[in-house]
Design a protein with these regions (language model features):
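Asp-based, Mg2+/Mn2+-dependent phosphohydrolase catalytic module
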Residues: 2-11, 77-94, 103-135, 139-193
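Active-site neighborhood of HAD-like aspartate-dependent phosphohydrolases
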Residues: 2-59
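Active-site flanking residues adjacent to catalytic metal/cofactor-binding acidic residues
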Residues: 15-17, 64, 137-138
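Residue-level signal for short segments within beta-strands and strand-turn junctions
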Residues: 23-25, 99, 157
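Substrate-recognition element of Asp-dependent hydrolases with the DxDx(T/V) motif
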Residues: 46, 50-83, 92-101, 146
Length: 193
């Protein structure tokens, strides 16, 4: 391959972290992120799901809001420690993290989900075709972020009290179920070509 060769855009699975990859901490019916590695527990089926998705040639990109850092209640180093460990455990290609506290806390940005900034940044870095990619998440912010970036969306429904603002393209019980759904879609696409 020479320098003039243009590679086709790649596809990605954008994964929310808490509630998709790891078990969130639930307080008053709402999910919260773990604050240290000792609280971080990878959910059952996640390693297998990642292998299935990688087998179809998708990049795996974690896109996570960690606003407690911007709000001063969690050290950035704690989040980075968790992400370093996560990259050793799973075939994740990149972790995109928004550390901003959010507009309510005087820390607005374009990367905090539901804004699509993290997905746009990853798409530029990795040459990702967003229209051929998926955003998988367990909260309304994830679904809206996926739509805002032009991705297909899969909602993992854990029965939180928080309601969705938009209907996702698909629903699954967990990441392995989402991977199996994508596998079925891939097989249908292969049958058409």
């Amino acid at each position: 391959m020479n320098a003039d060769t243009i590679l086709p855009p790649c596809r990605a699975i954008f994964l929310d972290r808490d509630g998709v990859i790891n078990r969130p901490l639930i307080r008053s019916g709402k999910p919260y992120p773990p604050s240290n590695l000792g609280e971080f527990e990878i959910l059952p089926g996640v390693p297998e799901a990642c292998e299935v998705l990688k087998g179809f040639g998708f990049y795996l990109v974690v896109a996570t809001n960690q606003p407690d850092v911007g709000r001063g209640t969690l050290a950035r180093s704690a989040v980075e420690t968790i992400h370093g460990w996560l990259l050793q455990q799973l075939p994740i290609d990149r972790v995109m993290t928004c550390y901003h506290g959010g507009a309510t806390y005087g820390d607005p940005c374009d990367c905090r989900k539901p804004q699509p900034g993290m997905l746009f940044q990853a798409a530029e870095l990795l040459k990702i075709n967003l229209a051929e990619s998926f955003m998988i998440g367990d909260r309304w912010r994830d679904v809206d972020c996926g739509f805002n970036a032009g991705c297909k969306t899969i909602f993992i429904d854990w029965g939180y009290e928080e309601k969705l603002k938009r209907d996702p393209n698909f629903r699954a019980h967990d990441l392995l179920g989402a991977a199996q759904l994508i596998e079925q879609l891939e097989q249908r696409n292969d049958a058409r070509t």
